[in-house]
Swiss-Prot record:
GO terms for biological process: phosphoenolpyruvate-dependent sugar phosphotransferase system. PROSITE patterns: PEP_ENZYMES_2 (PS00742), PEP_ENZYMES_PHOS_SITE (PS00370). The keyword Nucleus does not apply. GO terms for molecular function: kinase activity; metal ion binding; phosphoenolpyruvate-protein phosphotransferase activity. It is an enzyme of class 2 (transferase). The active site is at residues 191, 504. Its main location: cytoplasm. The gene is ptsI. This is Phosphoenolpyruvate-protein phosphotransferase. It comes from Staphylococcus aureus. Keywords: Cytoplasm, Kinase, Magnesium, Metal-binding, Phosphotransferase system, Sugar transport, Transferase, Transport.
Amino acid sequence: MSKLIKGIAASDGVAIAKAYLLVEPDLTFDKNEKVTDVEGEVAKFNSAIEASKVELTKIRNNAEVQLGADKAAIFDAHLLVLDDPELIQPIQDKIKNENANAATALTDVTTQFVTIFESMDNEYMKERAADIRDVSKRVLSHILGVELPNPSMIDESVVIVGNDLTPSDTAQLNKEFVQGFATNIGGRTSHSAIMSRSLEIPAIVGTKSITQEVKQGDMIIVDGLNGDVIVNPTEDELIAYQDKRERYFADKKELQKLRDADTVTVDGVHAELAANIGTPNDLPGVIENGAQGIGLYRTEFLYMGRDQMPTEEEQFEAYKEVLEAMGGKRVVVRTLDIGGDKELSYLNLPEEMNPFLGYRAIRLCLAQQDIFRPQLRALLRASVYGKLNIMFPMVATINEFREAKAILLEEKENLKNEGHDISDDIELGIMVEIPATAALADVFAKEVDFFSIGTNDLIQYTLAADRMSERVSYLYQPYNPSILRLVKQVIEASHKEGKWTGMCGEMAGDETAIPLLLGLGLDEFSMSATSILKARRQINGLSKNEMTELANRAVDCATQEEVIELVNNYVK
């Protein structure tokens, strides 16, 4: 008998495949157990080391093919740990001299090394501590005979099932085999949801307990259109959902006819539809879906899935690739936005009570200019290969923008002195995601070249509702009149100064929000590439004059529910 699990529809489509559980295995053992056959226990440990080497070599080679040599380098470091006699010998000695079982000897010795390395005031040694911790876990799994989940080694069609997907997890996903995913936690604007749309795979988030209700290898259906997961479907359900999937793909094929069409309302007003991307690997989807530019390039993904900072040269090559691929269309690059729900192990950032309100984004970059300046240099060098716009995230005060701009201009001068060509047509803007920034939009508009409204954070900060919390998800209201008023205020402030405003939050591709945003005068709608053609079809059927009237009425509503009802009455 099948089982229905409800969640939040995060990415359109229908996936049908076996479940692959991405959950932490049970690696517990009896720490006090002594062994009598010490030679046999040493052999068991040595066997686990060799098995780990074989496994890591496969993972490393697969990562190089799927993700590139830079992402594979982290596994080279892990292999070096397995060959380090200063680590291996003490473990073998502990087994021989103390009759310790292999698991205890491994964890005791590696814990000592990790503690020592983490206490050092040396970034390289702290990175080695992370390597030892990861390798120890892998060797322990072989000692205990427990298989570790490894999404990079998937070689058959699966649906990923997990508590949540971290940026590192998604960096390892092979789109050829991962048909979709379902998670316990998350909302439509969580990292895993955003990445599922970028990868163009169906996804359900916020199911609360799917990891407890699905077993490894269960056949499951992910209905990303309605938010349903069906576990072990009946034959009739399989047939019905296969038909639904075919109809979904048929509609996508029909939408392809709009790929090269203009985005223009019935009364002749043009709108610009751009794409959000995380890496150059997203470019084929951008081009296939007829994007008129890139409204958000999330550069933090260049820094993830690795054990050290990307070099200036690595960043330059990535930015150059994107700018060249877009053939002169506008590319808006957001500088490093780390913190909150996005962490880098090698930065060793302190834990904070409220990370979304803490040391992140532009705050981190201004404080740690050894991170910020190489990125700005790489961007400036790449600027001659296309139409580059640069925007700074999480700007709260005009002084933050001024300081960031001053650093950029300083690096621009340095590069020119070094003989590099730099474009003189780079626009500088900010993300508007803090209510204080929206409130002072008229002040910012005099100094920035453009605004990009990041509604994912603007909504949670304005309504004081954590977008990752299911318990307050009812307060995460994109159509709340307070949000619409802030958006209107930002757009009007930019237009008054002859500047433009885009939106790169998930709201920009939302079919209920699009009529409102069109009416408010939004210049650029930036969204997941998969949403572009649907948005184009929708906008091409709307009247700008009518949507302006709709938006003016919406900002005077009292509740989100009133706004939704108003939109539904206007747009039928």
